[in-house]
Structures are given as C-alpha cells and as structure tokens.
Amino acid sequence: MKVGVVGTGFVGSTAAFALVLRGSCSELVLVDRDEDRAQAEAEDIAHAAPVSHGTRVWHGGHSELADAQVVILTAGANQKPGESRLDLLEKNADIFRELVPQITRAAPDAVLLVTSNPVDLLTDLATQLAPGQPVIGSGTVLDSARFRHLMAQHAGVDGTHAHGYVLGEHGDSEVLAWSSAMVAGMPVADFMQAQNLPWNEQVRAKIDEGTRNAAASIIEGKRATYYGIGAALARITEAVLRDRRAVLTVSAPTPEYGVSLSLPRVVGRQGVLSTLHPKLTGDEQQKLEQSAGVLRGFKQQLGL
C-alpha cells in the first residue's frame, strides 16, 4: 500500500511520521518544491522504520506518486498576521490550480486527501480540478477529537469512551452537536448525572470554547499545530487503504448545502462511501446552515 504526501512542512512531515509509526502503509513518498527539505524529512522518518513497521520511505517528484492509493495534500501558504481568510484562500487556490493537475496525472486512481486551509473550500476546488477522482478533506476530524478529549477529561474517562461530532466548517462557524454526544454509551447529560458531575451551560460553554479555540491556544505557545492533525490524517488514510468503513467527520461536497463541509461520513477504499445526517436540535440545524452560508460566501467571492 502506497501513500504520497505533497508538502513536507510541519503537518505533512508529522502525518508521514504518524503513518510510519502506525504501520499504515508499506511505501511512503514525500514530495515538496523544496527538494532538500523533502529529502531530509524522508531520511529522518526512514530512520524510524527499523524500530516501528519497516515502511519504505523516500522523496521524489510528482512522478513518484504513481500507483499511490492515497495522496495527502498539505501544501500551501500559512495565514500571516493581518491577512484575511479570503487572502489566504486566493493564495492557496492558486497553488492548488498548479499542483492538483500534476498529482492527478501521476496518480489518477488515488484518493486525494486535502488538509491545506481553508480545507473545506480547497476540497471544493480540488474536486473541480480532479473530476471523477475521489477527493476528501480532513474537515473536522481533528475538531471532533478535541471535542471528545475535553468531554472525556470532564467525565474522568478514557478519551476513546467519549463520542461526539463537530459539524460544518473547519473554522469559526463549526457546530458542536451536543444532542448526539455520548459518554460510555450514555447521553452525555445522563452520564454526568449518574457520576454526580456538574453538567450545565457553563461546563458546555467551556468545552465548546476549548474545542473552538484549541488551535489558537496551541499556536500562541508553539507557533503551529501538527501532532493532532498528523494523527488524524493517518487515521483517515488507514480508513481508505484498509477499507475500514470508518465513520469520520471528513469534508466533502454536500449538494444540499452547496459547498464542501463536514458531516459524519462512511470512509473506505473509494473515499466517501455515504453521508450520515445525525438528528439535530433546531438550534444546531440553524447553526449548521449558517456555517454552510459562511462557506458559500467565500466560495462565491473566489468564483468557485
């Protein structure tokens, strides 16, 4: 099983490292316009293979992506202080218009996994640039993991026993679906009551804020986030490579909302196999529609 990573900055190289540590694939090629960086990252990560899963790791040009089952796109500019989201979108859209056709020529059968930001809009653009090829965005997989982590932390349980989805935009307008959140198979409110733990609007607001502002808090302390998203990308990639039929909140074109956004989706060998629509409260549904509206506004401004 072969995976390509295009873009070897913090996110791309950390995703590659996670793939090797988890034994997600047998072959891994790193591609970057900065060939020296790609070579150095590939060599460094390859040194982890003998003490993990023996993955073959190397660097190369776009032609080396041939026969990859998944290509992860992390290439793009980072948002600078004072730069608007539209400015960032226009800059990264130009990068994608140059990059995606090269990738599709080299790996026409690969599932394209987009994680460059703004991920929902670039997922839409990549879908247009690679007609007929499966495209998914990392969406709110990381946001959902943050949500579950904070819920589990408050509940005092292992994070794998907390379940909840973050829907809509990967960004400011994202929606925490509290109505379907569960801990240990119980509705979250019931679990907290059974454990005599506080559960009120103040607690929910703290978890919401912690989920929504996690990236900003981490960036303030260390200038970038990459471990969480690197692990999330490895998880999504495995779902495709091994046809796991995993339910993940990836971003994909959603006709009823007119834009790519995150909903729970079944992910397998061909990318998104089906989309699930959890039952939401009226308030959650309204917020999801507002989130879609925010994305449509940016999409129209860019002319996508």
Swiss-Prot record:
Entry keyword set: Allosteric enzyme, Cytoplasm, NAD, Oxidoreductase
Lineage: Bacteria, Thermotogati, Deinococcota, Deinococci, Deinococcales
PROSITE patterns registered for this protein in UniProt: L_LDH
Keyword NAD applies: yes
Organism of this sequence: Deinococcus radiodurans (strain ATCC 13939 / DSM 20539 / JCM 16871 / CCUG 27074 / LMG 4051 / NBRC 15346 / NCIMB 9279 / VKM B-1422 / R1)
Subcellular location: Cytoplasm
Catalysis performed (reactions): (S)-lactate + NAD(+) = pyruvate + NADH + H(+)
EC numbers for this chain: 1.1.1.27
GO biological process annotation, one example: lactate metabolic process
Summary of temperature dependence: Optimum temperature is 48 degrees Celsius.
Protein name as catalogued: L-lactate dehydrogenase
Entry function: Catalyzes the conversion of lactate to pyruvate.
Protein family per UniProt: Belongs to the LDH/MDH superfamily. LDH family.
Gene3D superfamilies, sorted: Lactate dehydrogenase/glycoside hydrolase, family 4, C-terminal, NAD(P)-binding Rossmann-like Domain
Documented activity regulation: Allosterically activated by fructose 1,6-bisphosphate (FBP).
Pathway: Fermentation; pyruvate fermentation to lactate; (S)-lactate from pyruvate: step 1/1
Main location: cytoplasm
Residues holding beta-D-fructose 1,6-bisphosphate: R148, H163
Top-rank EC class of the record's enzyme: oxidoreductase
Binding residues for NAD(+): V11, D32, R37, G76, A77, S138
UniProt feature coiled coil, ranges: none
GO CC entries: cytoplasm
UniProt-annotated catalytic positions: H170
